[in-house]
Amino acid sequence: MSGDAAIEIVRVFVVSGTEEVAMAAPTARPLSAVASASPVPRVGRSAMARSRTTTATRSRATDSATPAVTTPASDAEWAASSPLEFGPSVADVASCDALAVVGKKACVLDERMLAHVPEVVRAHVRALAEAMTPGDGGAKRTTSVLISNSDASESLLELTVVILPDASALSRHNAPSGSHAAAKWLAQLKTPKSGKTLGVACALPDASEAVAIAAAIARAFPTYSAKSTACRHTERGRGAVAVNGTVRVALFDASASAAGDAGAVTGDALASAAAVADGVRLAARIVDTPPASMDPDALVAEALNACAELNARSGVSPVTATTLREAELIAGGFGGIVGVGAAAARDGREPALVHLCHRGARGAAARSVALVGKGITFDTGGLQIKGKGGMPGMKTDLGGAAATLGAFRAAVTLDPDGARRGGGDLHCVLCIAENAVGASAFRPDDVLLCKSGRSVEINNTDAEGRLVLADGVAFASGETIDADDVVDVATLTGAQMVATGRHFAGIVSDSEAFETACVRAGRISGDLTHPLPYAPEFFSKEFGSAVADMRNSVKDRSNAQTSCAGQFVANHLAPDFSGASGGRDGAAAKRWLHVDIAGPATEKGSGRGTGFGVALLVELLRATGRREDE
């Protein structure tokens, strides 16, 4: 879909028991397109005009024969189907149908928090907490408590106590909040059914841990589900999404000196926790959605819906959106994105580049930041196709784009005029394509001309993510955006998991200060990162080509593959990012940061999205605004 084509959105019905609730469909926004006069991106090949059937057209043509799957059409509707609330008091969550108390042992046993819990429950919380030794992974125990109700009846309360590891039990590279343990244990709890509530009382040693724990809670209660309901046999129940009950979260600061409600986390800390949790759930849902539903058109629509949501809020500086589809990408010289998305485009799933921009109060006088996300909606490996064991799960290859979009929405929500980040502009660039197999697929030995002007010989069609990112960072660092800081986020290499594992993203940067700030942001947010070598003199040579400026895959797969992949992306930055000093108006040198989230973007075992990267980027933007990264 391109130009002024509108997004078709169907009205949604969500089934809860035998009740059907109609959810209003959001207003469709047209896709804007901007083209520039540049050479055709693929070397030695002219662009071919293709007629195609859009997703909307296909659905209209088949509606009469195939029942529509009545899934929510917007993030707000998905969130409404499985509500997560931050802000209730401890007393409020203690009155829910089930209760989980979470925190380090000393905080859980804090009498100021326990004073808000019914006395009979309080005794069980103490007993369970005292009996547990959390070690370095935390611990959980569950019991049932007989509660006397105000009408003289009795009921059973399912009580769970989760004790997080003390900071002293965790290594220096881990997050002192122990948020990894919170996510692990809370994920074992059942999401409440419609009409029921689950209360989560979080006892924190400090309000600064609120975001990390909130992100962990968001991971434990994701929104996407295609599981059928009890009404699946009815016409409207077939394919419907069940409405879950509400998870209500109270955050209590055990370090507060005053007693009672004075310990409740409020203000900026609470707002940050809620906004980041929303961003994490958005990113996780995008990753979890099947590729037939989350195709390039759908991912573009997610970005435009986020833009519309932000613009609908009062006090938010305008957010602009520019969308380039295949014809505009060809005209603009985005050869990497066009090449990767060529086969899917023939079937109507055109590649795209989406640019969201939130102008800060100081504009060009302050540092601007561009978040660039890899959005491969499905990766078959291309003509060098993945095997039967390697292709399942490749719907998650858009995790970088999902994380940057979730972080952008959270950052703008928390910083309506950009003051928190120093008043500079914030950009989000999504590089979207499906790496499909077909007659139009790019081939080994093809040469692509990327946005940077560099030519790339293809020696691995399954190393496609770096090609779309190359165009993204060239766009972000070039004259159109001219960002001071460029951060690219991607599920880029399986080698990342070999280098830094499933809990740590691997990062590469040309700035030691930026690298250090990212590591610190990871420990604060719970989205852990670890530096990998930045050495262009060693790694650029891996991409040598006899016929082009470079190849897209390394010669030596044992030579720091993840660093090499990052270096490939860096080679497409504007020239003033190559270690030059000065920057705009005497500011620090322009900087680049590469974040490979291949491992932590999904949960091992379930394969579900984690929303990793949202909390990290929001904290990194906060640190950048306060100049804590210099």
Question: What do the predicted segments below correspond to?
Answer:
Residues M1-A5, A264-V265, G424:
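Short intrinsically disordered, low-complexity coil segments enriched in acidic
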Residues S2, S16, S32, S36-S38, ...:
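Serine residues within intrinsically disordered or low-complexity segments
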Residues A6-E8, V12-V14, A22-V43:
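N-terminal chloroplast transit peptides
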Residues R60-S368, V372-G375:
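Short amphipathic alpha-helical segment within the helicase RecA-like ATPase core
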Residues V300-E630:
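A generic structural signal for tightly packed, nonpolar segments enriched in small/aliphatic residues
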